[in-house]
Every structure is written in C-alpha cells, then in structure tokens.
Amino acid sequence: MIAEPTLAQAAHAWGAQGIPFNDEPKNDLFRTASIERATTLLNQSVALRSVMLLSGENGVGKSALAGRWLRSLEPKVYFPVCITQASLTGIGLLALFLQKLGKAPKHQRSASLKLLEEAFGELGRLIPVLLLDEAQNYAMSALEEVRMLLGLNLPEQPAFALILVGDSYLLSTLRLRSHRALYSRIAAHARIEGLSRSELEPTSNTSCARWESNVPALNRLRSNF
C-alpha cells in the first residue's frame, strides 16, 4: 500500500526523504535467494513461452515481484498482460484478455477465439505474456479456459507465456483431477520464501536507507531500529 499523502507530508516536515517499508513501484525489492531464483525462472519461462507457477504464503512479496518483473520486460520482445480480477468466469477472462490485446470481444466464443488469433498475429514477433494474480481464487471454468487458449497454436509453439501467481493452496488445487491437464503443462515452479534470520538485518537497512533525515533524533531512531 502506497503511503498516504498526509504521512508523506509529515515525513517531509520532519526532514525525512522517504518512508521505509512502503511498496512504491520505484523502490527495488531486496534480492533474497528465493526472489533471485524466481526471477531467473520467470525470464526463462517467458522466453520459451511456457507455463510457470509462482507461489508462496500471503505477504511474502509474490505480487510485488510479479508486478515489477512484468514492467521490466523488454517492450520490443514481449507484450505483457496482467489480470487480477480473480472473480472472472472463463468467458469473462477471455473477454478481458481480448480487451487488453486491443480487441472488442464478441458474444460468441468462436468469434472471440478468431479475434484472439488475429491479435496474436498482429503482435508479430512479440511474445504475449499473460500473468494471472491470485490464481487460487479463479473459478474452474476460468483456469480451463486458459488451458485451452494455450493450445491455439498447436502443433506450433504455445501462443503465449502463462504465469500463475498464487498462494500455497494453488499448487494443491492444480493437482486435482479437474485441473490435471493444466498442471501437466507447468514447466517451472518457484516458491517465494519469507525472510530468513540472516536476511532480516540487510533488508531493514536497505529500506531504512531511504529514510535519511535532517533531524538528528530521527537518525538515531533509525540507527537503533
């Protein structure tokens, strides 16, 4: 959550240059071992147009990592699409995917699929990357729709890269028989872990370094944190 304007104003009044432990997009994440591994697998997955699962407990930074990584993709190589509305049905997800690709969805699924193929064709050499956040909350119809869309280009390479972001329950859900077809397509799985004891201090120092202040008392408070 980005800091409230009143909090930012108060920090400025005290001479602080920033607020520690906020999630402004311009702030880099602390590169833990699990984040480094996840980033490597994310880059490999999109390059190969494969399916990847990014999981972890609530609050470990999955969405923060996914968002920053998605925005960092080279626009001359990739066309990123992020969908966060986990309440969508299969038809709704297809419609939103089309809209984000610049197409107006049709009432008939067959017509929408034809538009989707046209959109992929218009992208040329750009690789579409679809990221579904909070994927554990998607209805079975939505996940099944995504699985079928992956096969649009068969027997050629997949039509797009798919990144599923979710909590620890997502992997268990995908292992169920109803989702076995999608589960079998997962080429990589990265789990974001919470900070280890050895990572806590450098993480705190990195964040607090943004809280430089002209007020000596505040700097002493930071040093004692």
Each PLM stretch: what is its role?
Residues 70-72, 170-185:
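Short regulatory helix/loop adjacent to the ATP-binding pocket of P-loop NTPases
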Residues 2-12, 16-20, 88-96, 104-145, ...:
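Mid-core helix/loop region of P-loop NTP-binding domains shared across ATPases and GTPases
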Residues 1-48:
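A short, basic N-terminal segment
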Residues 55, 84, 132:
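Residues at the beta-strand->loop junction immediately N-terminal to the Walker
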Residues 83-86, 174, 187-199:
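Conserved AAA+ ATPase "SRH/arginine-finger" region at the nucleotide-binding site
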Residues 48-68:
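Walker A/P-loop nucleotide-binding motif
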